[in-house]
Amino acid sequence: MEYTTINPATEEELYTYHQTTDNEIEQILDESQTSFRSWRNHSFNFRAEKLFKIASLLRKNKYALCNAMAIEMGKPIAQGLTEIEKCAVVCDYYAENSEKFLSDKHIRTERTSSYVSFQPIGPILAIMPWNFPFWQVFRFAAPNVMLGNSVILKHAPNVSKCSILIENLFKEADFPSNLFSNLLISSENVPAIVSKIIPDKRISGVTLTGSAIAGSFVASLAGKYLKKSVLELGGSDAYVILKDADLNLAVPQCVTSRMNNTGQTCIAAKRFIVDETIADEFIELYIDESKKYIPGDPLNEYVNMGPMARRDLQLNVHNQVLLSIKEGAKLELGGQIPERKGFFYPPTVLTNIKSDSLVFNEEIFGPVASIITFNNENEAIQLANSTDFGLGAAIFTQDIEKGNLIAKEKLEAGSCFVNEFVKSDPRLPFGGIKSSGFGRELSELGIREFANIKTVVVK
């Protein structure tokens, strides 16, 4: 079976791929398990040497890798360069720190020795999305290969070239054959094939970054077969703008968060909850800042906004905007599909949003900002927490003590930032709560998710 990828900026066909066959999947599962059994016995220094090499290769080949992202899913070159550097940083970070993170933790008891050891568990299936084709993979793969696990990647089919380039990086860095493997699977066949792979005894765990629907499917299947799973799902991140916020700081941060990657980011700001006394000024400044984002050719290094990754994504966002307007939202900016080739969508701003509306409660995966007003802080926090999502949140205020308290104790999310837009950092754990998933990636905590946290006692 074959499938073809499409350039979202030109609508031209790119590449045709042969789907990985059942026999090839069987071979990959066998070889992944064999590679794991050997790899786990190598020293941290041995593993780190190869991961450092990948970091070097990422930096060396950054323009070629960025070009692949630009033509496959529409990411502008400038944003692609940032993504590739972040991948190199996460490789360096785990190469430098994994031995420390995974060292035995001794606990004093009446025995001669009692300690916790962190051991690899085996091949891990990674089901990854298209929006950050390299970062989503490396933030998971880097810690897991340092832990000693092997990785089988099922990437989004519209970024198949990126997935092949990632696999080639592992080969060029002299990792063992099939320690990192890549499955090419068309969208319509993903549920059936994943349903066969997860129950397989050669798979020890599964991680997914994607929608809540996909996460529920994978988690239920993993749970049925008692496989460890980690899920990073969608978000409808709320940014709370208190009346004492510095709008010259807040607005650029808010717009950057919403517009990055054409709004196709799980941890993007999606709902702006603004004190009613400053709402008019915030809206005016937000619209002015949004107009700086002009859709264009992602291969042009000066373009700051590319197309959406697929036609169905463009149409879905547009339909959400139209329905929101029917529900009473006011269109302040954008909201029209441009008459041009490509799956472009303009910066769009909606106001007069009600808490029971679609745009408030659903994730909008595109460059659409929803602005909601409040008249007291308790109402703001209630609005921020009232959806099923809990990935990220931010608060803007000049009262740092208050901002810290609200971020720490009152906002329901896996990451809460004060006076800055939410972003992932290799040094900090990342993940969500509620319908935004469970488990953590990155940091010392992330590398332990797919470890056997083993208690060892010597009398």
What residue ranges belong to the model's regions?
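N-terminal Rossmann-like NAD(P)+-binding subdomain of aldehyde/semialdehyde dehydrogenases
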Residues: 1-112
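Residues at or immediately preceding the N-termini of alpha-helices
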Residues: 8, 22-25, 44, 62, ...
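Conserved C-terminal structural/oligomerization subdomain of aldehyde/semialdehyde dehydrogenase
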Residues: 10-16, 203, 240, 294, ...
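Residue-level signal for inorganic ion chemistry
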Residues: 11, 47, 69, 91, ...
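ALDH superfamily catalytic-core signature
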Residues: 14, 174, 213-354, 382, ...
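Short, well-ordered beta-strand elements within core beta-sheets of diverse protein domains
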Residues: 15-20, 35-41, 126, 239-242, ...
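Structural signal for hydrophobic packing residues in well-ordered secondary-structure cores
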Residues: 36, 40, 55-62, 66, ...
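Rossmann-like NAD(P) dinucleotide-binding subdomain of oxidoreductase/dehydrogenase enzymes
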Residues: 107-249, 374
